[in-house]
Regions:
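Helix-to-loop junction immediately C-terminal to a conserved catalytic motif
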Residues: 84
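Conserved ABC transporter NBD signature motif
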Residues: 92-100
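Conserved ABC ATPase signature
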Residues: 170-174, 178
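A short, proline-enriched helix->beta-strand linker immediately N-terminal to the Walker B motif
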Residues: 189-193
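Conserved ABC ATPase "signature" C-loop
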Residues: 249-250
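The conserved cystathionine-beta-synthase
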Residues: 298-323, 327-330, 338-351
Length: 351
């Protein structure tokens, strides 16, 4: 499961977007001014403009993985490109560690990308004439690092992503999953604080995609990066995210934790994604537990489960108990009780 973002880290917004718009078309700025920020995608389309991002405001906290999810054309990749300034916004403000991204000079922007941002895209974009090691070392050499230092760092990254033994292979000798590992290692070689990933696994076969998701979660557990991850796959979003932002027609329909989105979809559009989601695979014990109330220790089972544990991982153990199970926090303090009836209802109540 994704890492949990502490309340302390939530105070530190690494990325902040304030009323960001991206509208394509010759009359984009004029149309936006005329609309006074109340953008109607159909009206803009009739005027020859395409709305990519419509008044996006949110923050991404230190160490958080925010997954931006939506169907094709929803604006999710455009939003990522605005935040990395691969695409210029039409209006709004973007801040990276409190600095105004849109006010940076070209030199400052290049320096920011080289030292603070790592990017991975659906296309592996490996250099075919370079080996695994040379591909990983390439951004370090562009920065001006020595060949020796670059190669030593590349060796570390190759080992980190499970490519040790294949350092001297060329891209054509690797599978799709292995090629994407090279792309991931290359993006991490510069030790970025912020990691942008735009549908990095969507071109892979389902089994390889699952393997890469597992690897990605392992890496995040080790590196604790601030991540903006784009996908069109709701299951992938649920599996990876600390929070999910669901987009439609350039608008963020809802931004919340996976559990809250499944339990409390904000719009009918969001609800369509959540209807078929098995609740036990998403919800944790905290989201379905009851208060202790008048329950005494003798009324409780000896079994204890973490409040962060996903129901699917503990349901068998909970259902084997005759008494309510204590739900505990990271300090082993009892914060609630999980009743068998709640778990049974979650598993079978809507079937």
């Amino acid at each position: 499961m994704p890492s949990k973002v502490s309340s302390d880290k939530k105070k530190n917004a690494v990325i902040k977007c304030d009323s960001v718009y991206k509208i394509f078309g010759d009359n984009a700025k004029k149309m936006l001014q005329k609309s006074n920020g109340n953008v109607d995608a159909k009206e803009f389309q009739d005027a020859g403009c395409v709305v990519g991002v419509n008044s996006a405001s949110f923050e991404v906290y230190e160490g958080e993985m925010l997954v931006v999810m939506g169907l094709s054309g929803s604006g999710k990749s455009t939003l990522l490109r605005c935040i990395s300034r691969l695409t210029d916004t039409t209006a709004g403000n973007i801040y990276i560690d409190g600095k105004d991204l849109l006010a940076l000079s070209d030199k400052e922007l290049i320096n920011l990308r080289r030292n603070k941002m790592g990017m991975v895209f659906q296309s592996f974009a490996l250099l075919p004439h370079k080996t695994v090691l040379e591909n990983i070392a390439f951004p370090l050499q562009v920065k001006g690092n020595s060949t020796k230092d670059s190669m030593n760092r590349a060796l570390e990254m190759a080992k980190l992503v499970g490519l040790d033994g294949r350092e001297n292979y060329f891209p054509r000798q690797l599978s799709g999953g292995q090629q994407q590992r090279v792309g991931i290692a290359r993006s991490l070689a510069v030790e970025p604080d912020i990691w942008f990933l735009d549908e990095p696994f969507s071109a892979l076969d389902p089994l390889i995609r699952k393997e890469m998701q597992d690897e990605f979660l392992r890496l995040q557990g080790v590196l604790n990066k601030t991540i903006l991850f784009v996908t069109h796959d709701f299951d992938e979003a649920l599996r990876l995210a600390d929070r999910i932002a669901i987009m439609k027609d350039g608008i963020i329909e809802q931004i919340d934790t996976p559990a809250n989105i499944v339990l409390n979809p904000a719009t009918e559009y969001v609800a369509k994604f959540t209807r078929e989601v098995p609740r036990e695979k998403v919800l944790n014990c905290e989201s379905v537990m009851d208060e202790i109330g008048d329950l005494a220790d003798s009324d409780m089972s000896q079994l204890r489960v973490s409040k962060d544990a996903i129901i699917e991982t503990v349901c068998e153990a909970v259902l084997s108990e005759q008494k309510p199970v204590a739900v505990v926090d990271k300090n082993d303090k009892v914060v609630g009780a999980l009743h068998c009836s709640k778990v049974i209802h979650m598993l079978f109540g809507s079937k």
